[in-house]
Amino acid sequence: MKNVFKALTVLLTLFSLTGCGLKGPLYFPPADKNAPPPTKPVETQTQSTVPDKNDRATGDGPSQVNY
């Protein structure tokens, strides 16, 4: 039984260590100081207060219409 726990401990340790550093460094490299700033303009989106479609029925109750 002790051999099983030792083997599982070794396998778990090796398995957890294999993931270390596989995707490169674990930090972000410093930004390039000569890189130009982004040139894409920021577009502001405004939301209308009037709905595009009226989803009410002919009376005051809501409709079950799927557009």
From Swiss-Prot:
Membrane topology category: Lipid-anchor
Compartments, record wording: Cell outer membrane
Residue positions of covalent lipid attachment, annotated as N-palmitoyl cysteine: C20
Disordered as annotated region, ranges: 26-67
Pfam families: LptM_cons (PF13627)
Stretch forming the signal peptide: 1-19
UniProt keyword annotation of Signal present: yes
Lipid anchor positions (S-diacylglycerol cysteine): C20
Major localization listed first in the record, in broad terms: membrane
Consequences of knocking out this gene: Inactivation of the gene impairs LptD oxidative maturation and causes the accumulation of intermediate oxidation forms. It prolongs the residence of LptD and LptE at the BAM complex.
Assigned GO CC terms: cell outer membrane
GO BP terms in the entry: Gram-negative-bacterium-type cell outer membrane assembly
Keywords annotated in UniProt: Cell outer membrane, Lipoprotein, Membrane, Palmitate, Signal
Polar residues biased stretches: 42-51
Assigned protein family: Belongs to the LptM family.
Self-association and partners: Interacts with the outer membrane embedded portion of the LPS translocon formed by LptD and LptE (LptDE). LptM binds to sites in both LptD and LptE, forming a 1:1:1 heterotrimeric complex.
NCBIfam families: SS_mature_LptM
Record function comment: Component of the lipopolysaccharide (LPS) transport (Lpt) pathway that promotes efficient assembly of the outer membrane LPS translocon (LptDE) by the BAM complex. Facilitates oxidative maturation of LptD by stabilizing a conformation of the LPS translocon in which LptD can efficiently acquire native disulfide bonds, thereby activating the LPS translocon. Might stabilize an active conformation of the LPS translocon by mimicking its natural substrate.
Protein name: LPS-assembly lipoprotein LptM
Species of the source: Escherichia coli (strain K12)
